[in-house]
Amino acid sequence: MYSRYILTGALLMLALKGYSQTDTASLDSVFKDEELKEVKVVARKPGTSRLAGAVNGIAVNKDELFKAACCNLGESFTTNPSVDVAYNDATTGARQIKLLGLSGTYVQMLTENLPNFRGAAIPYALGYVPGPWMKGIQVSKGSASVKNGYESITGQINVDYLQPEDEQQVEVNLFGDTKSRIEANADANVHLSDKWATEILLHHENILQNHDDNGDGFYDMPGREQYNVQNRWVYKGKNYIFHGGLGALKEIRTSGQDTEHVHSDDIYRIKLHTNRYEGYMKHAFILNHEHGTNIAFMSSASMHQLDAQYGNKFYDLNEKNLYSSLMFETNFSTQHNLSLGVSVNHDYLGQRANVNVSPRPTVGLEESPYLLSDMQRINEKETTPGAYAQYTYTLGTKLTAMAGVRIDHSSIYGNFFTPRFHVKYSPIDAISIRLSAGKGYCTVFALAEYNYLLSSGRNLNISKDLKQEEAWNYGLSTAFYIPMFGKTLKLNAEYYYTSFENQAVVDYDANKELIAIYNLRGKSYSHTFQIDASYPLLRGLEITAAYRLNDVKCTYDYGKSLMEKPLTSKYKALFTASYKTPLGLWQFDATVQLNGGGRNPESYQLADGSPSWSPRFHSFEQVSAQVTRWFRHWSIYVGGENLTGFKQKTPIYGASTPWGSDFEPTLVWGPVEGRMFYAGVRVHF
């Protein structure tokens, strides 16, 4: 036992030596929503399960995360048919989740049921959550619950970290791949008493060498070095529960032209220096154990600092966020649950940039465009207090209905109303039908959220009067549990429709000289249909097959044309197989993906008369595989990703002239790197 205290203290001292600490731990929600409960099954523990409440979604546990390298949150959905993770930019490595055919700005990101990763963190947040830190992920589709705010339009992704109160142990995870990337992770927790526990989480990663495998003179992916640390505490008494923690992150990304192939003093360089600090606390006062009556106060704060250079464009940011929520919840009986709460969210973005943008009139700056040589201050802020009420009716296992409303007041946009409704009906145990309808809103801090677009040679033109994004989402899903040959076939089919009333449109089509962001003038919608099935074919062998069809369109060119959303695949097919030997010593996992083609932005004519790029991109396949050998206190794994070796032929257009308007690295629709092999070891004691 004392060795664990010593190791935990050593890890804490090492973290303090690495850099100053503050932040990101989130606690697992003291009072989880009913929809976050999982269906329990017997036999080999499945890596995913359906959420048991009225909200449609899935829960992903560590068994699923172990099926791939899963170095961070962005690499945790390789085997998931519902969630796509795509690169937005070949030079910065910006990546976003796509859910229901729409980008991650419409997916509310939570860490242990606290809103997180806003503004400038959005393009890079998937790399801020190390995979070995995660205990599980819940993906809710549609408008989700009103408890956590109004921002969920296509869904919520909630990350649960390893907990201080988990079984005491020390874990170490080491990883390396053939692209010169190395990672080291460590975590340790100690039970200080029967009520108090603490843990330390450490992460370091480094890409030791840049690569230019396609010979275009630019690095295929940015160099990246990251330090990440969290310290978390928990107290669990009979009538009072506390969770709290601090965390800090430091990351440096470097990219641009390969200096070995460019003999010039005028090298195009990209540098992003990020410092992020977070802190949170949760207090739960249990008033009545029999009825689950409790009052809870939750609060989180973060500061995100970014110092960025994109060629001769510069962007500096100091972003601060404060969120607090006071909640009351009780079960009047086994059938009736009521949740009430108030919350406040405050965002402040202090920015400096030398780009052509038009800020909101509330900032008090002139409307005239800025010269490239001028650094301008662009300060934005919003405070949004609100209140919600949510009622849940449960009739045994047959029916669960949840209705919630929010009323919020934005210091920019005034009052707005958020209704949401979910129902689950099970006529028999083998069938579940879910319906949902709800509204969601997003405030757009365009320059922060789309700062990776500054790497383009085009000018970035942001409208000065962007409205709050506003959309309705409707969903229908059915789940079948079909007995077949002594086992159960799990079959799921779902359809979702998202319709925007207001949207910040990112337009590549209107003008070859600029990328424009402006208010929607016309229609914008997404239709998504998905069917998936899983079956334990043999003892220890689980297979999953899925197909998803997307129809995503938006009105571009300032209201002139309703077109397919660019860089969005029309469909996706996925097949996974996972086999674990009877004694559990060996595990074999494989995933095959077929990603459909889609539309590229409107091309234009180059000086030589040729088109800048093809009007459409084609479908492509990807294969990944991993073999794991399990031992009592450790495991070793080897694998490969993108084994088909497919790469987008031209991830950077105009690479030979990076200082011109033809330079375009942000039109990424496929892999930018070829085959990659990796190996790692996990040790716990």
Describe each PLM feature range.
Residues 114-141, 229, 463:
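Short acidic/polar hinge/loop motifs at secondary-structure boundaries
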Residues 294-308, 426, 434, 467-525:
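Membrane-embedded beta-barrel scaffold of Gram-negative outer-membrane proteins
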Residues 394-397, 495-499, 519-604, 682-684:
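Gram-negative outer-membrane beta-barrel transporters
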Residues 543, 594-603, 628-685:
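C-terminal beta-signal and adjacent terminal beta-strands/loops
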Residues 35-68, 96, 137:
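N-terminal periplasmic "start-of-domain" segments of outer-membrane beta-barrel proteins
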Residues 73-76, 95-98, 125-130, 139, ...:
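N-terminal periplasmic accessory domains that precede
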Residues 74-115:
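Extracytoplasmic beta-strand/coil segments of soluble accessory domains associated
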Residues 24, 207-228, 234-295, 301-319:
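Flexible loop and strand-edge segments within Gram-negative outer membrane beta-barrel domains
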